[in-house]
Each structure stands twice: as C-alpha cells, then as structure tokens.
C-alpha cells in the first residue's frame, strides 16, 4: 500500500504512529511510505531514522528512496547505499523525471539491484 505518512517534516498532516494505526484499523499489515518528506528520503541516514522509528509500530512499514537528490532530477541518489540502508524501491513520487537519459540511468541502477522504480511521468504543461 502506497502511503504518505509525511514523517519526517510534515507530521501535522500524518506521522508514522497515526498512519500505522489507521492502516492497521483498515486491515493493512504492510505499507510503503513515499519519499516526499522533509528532509527528502535521499540519504541513508534519513531512511535509517524512519525505519528505526517504525520498528515497534503495529504494522510493517517499508520506505522507498528518492531517485534523485532533492527531487531535482539532476543527480541520482546512491542506489546501493539506499538499498543497504533499507530502501524497498525508488521514486521521485509526484515529480516527473524529464530527462530521458537520466531516467534510463536510474532504471538501469534499480534493475541491477533487483529493485522496483516507480515513475510519475507527466508533462506539467
């Protein structure tokens, strides 16, 4: 289940605790949190913090990594380091990767690690 728990940074909307209890009440046992938090989930430290705080929640909380640093579509995150930190996939959720070469490189890196990459491609025009 794709979720936006908004933790860290936007916990006035939702957080790990309230989101996990709501998911459990709805019968969901596992959720995948998106990376559009503050800070963005684009470093191993951020992902490790989230997963550590999720350890004692009533459901399984998984975390995706951003594809690009800062969701800027210019520099890829360190895919291997993010997987090692616990990422279950990659996405710049809600922000299209407009450079085809950059997107292709991201897909190659994700495939080499046998990890999914989820794209939200659209022309904002």
List each language-model region with its residue ranges.
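Metal-associated gating/positioning segment near the N- to mid-region
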Residues: 1-54
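Histidine/acidic-residue-rich, glycine-tolerant segments that coordinate divalent metal ions
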Residues: 37-49, 53-125
């Amino acid at each position: 289940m794709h979720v936006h728990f908004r933790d860290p940074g936007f916990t006035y909307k939702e957080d790990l605790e309230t989101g996990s209890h709501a998911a459990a009440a709805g019968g969901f046992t596992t959720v995948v949190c998106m990376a559009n938090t503050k800070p963005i989930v684009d470093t191993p430290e951020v992902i490790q913090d989230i997963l550590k705080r999720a350890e004692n929640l009533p459901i399984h909380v998984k975390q995706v990594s951003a594809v690009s640093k800062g969701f800027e579509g210019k520099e890829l995150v360190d895919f291997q380091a993010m997987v090692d930190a616990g990422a279950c996939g990659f996405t710049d959720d809600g922000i299209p990767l407009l450079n085809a070469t950059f997107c292709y490189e991201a897909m190659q890196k994700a495939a080499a690690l046998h990890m999914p990459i989820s794209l939200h491609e659209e022309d904002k025009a």
